[in-house]
């Protein structure tokens, strides 16, 4: 099962939890703590660890 775009995700897991191939778990955070995490869509311009294994 995967998490739809815009829904809450686990910021401590990898980005493959989000349904979209170019999706990633976008969080607010500081000093290793993460909160307000939702599945967002990245582009090639972002440096997020986008899951390409889908």
UniProtKB/Swiss-Prot annotation:
Record's superkingdom? Eukaryota
- Looking at the Swiss-Prot or TrEMBL record, what is one Pfam family this protein matches? Toxin_34
Q: In which tissues is it expressed?
A: Expressed by the venom gland.
What is a single cellular component term in the Gene Ontology annotation? extracellular region
Q: Where in the cell is it found?
A: Secreted
Disulphide linkage map: 2-19, 9-25, 16-51, 18-39, 27-37
Known InterPro entries for this protein? Omega-agatoxin_II/III_CS, Toxin_34
Q: One MF term in GO for this entry?
A: calcium channel regulator activity
Keywords (A to Z) from UniProt: Calcium channel impairing toxin, Disulfide bond, Ion channel impairing toxin, Knottin, Neurotoxin, Secreted, Toxin, Voltage-gated calcium channel impairing toxin
Report whether Protein transport shows up as a keyword of the record: no
Q: What is known of its domains?
A: The presence of a 'disulfide through disulfide knot' structurally defines this protein as a knottin.
User: Would you identify the family this protein belongs to, as annotated?
Assistant: Belongs to the neurotoxin 04 (omega-agtx) family. 03 (type II/III omega-agtx) subfamily.
Function recorded in the entry: Omega-agatoxins are antagonists of voltage-gated calcium channels (Cav). Causes rapid general flaccid paralysis followed by death in 10-30 minutes when injected in mice at dose levels of 5 ug per mouse.
User: What is the official name of this protein in its record?
Assistant: U1-ctenitoxin-Pr1a
Q: What is the lineage of its organism?
A: Eukaryota, Metazoa, Ecdysozoa, Arthropoda, Chelicerata
């Amino acid at each position: 099962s995967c998490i739809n775009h815009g829904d809450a995700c686990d910021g401590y897991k990898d980005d493959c939890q989000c349904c979209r191939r170019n999706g990633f778990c976008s969080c607010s955070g500081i000093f290793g703590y993460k909160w307000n995490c939702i599945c967002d869509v990245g582009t090639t311009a972002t440096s997020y660890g986008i899951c390409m294994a889908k």
